[in-house]
Amino acid sequence: MANVTVYNMEGNEVGTMELNDAVFGVEVNEHLVHLAVVRQLANKRQGTQKAKTRSEVSGGGRKPWRQKGTGHARQGSIRAAQWTGGGIIFAPTPRDYEVKMNKKERRAALKSALTSNVQDNKVVVVDSLALADAKTKEMQKVLTNLKAEKALIVTAQEDKNVILSARNIENVQTVAANGINVYDVMSHGTVVVTKDAVASIEEVYA
């Protein structure tokens, strides 16, 4: 099992913690991590784009002028693509962007993402994030003490003070342990996680 240093909110070392290899020490599968990120971003797409093709635009059934003798270029319909108000060639239509992964793959991808961050020393474990008040200044001070930039803050449960304190800090995001996901883990420079959150993650994924 990997040993990591545990810090307090002042950035001082207060002990060590063993991380479960079944979650934080697996063989990293980069393909699954990539697939999980692609899936998450694709599944957020709305997919309701729509434009009308030539056959769907109203009007244009009559030839605008005769074929020859007018001096104009020949035209067959005022709803052809080159006309203002005409149809769109290869117009976008509503579609479902969903990418599927089974549960086993999703779990393996998250474990790989967490392991990769541990190996790269991007995981900072804190004994607690017990903020007395919801103040951005206090959270910024904690993150500075922990040398955590572009941080993902993971708590055991949703913590109102942590959420309110961090929401106005650029490139900082909060998530409860039960909502942790591959994209958030991989898109932040540092994962700041409480001891209780580590226990919650290990309980679910070990």
Region locations from a protein language model:
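Exposed boundary/loop context
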Residues: 4, 8, 18, 40, ...
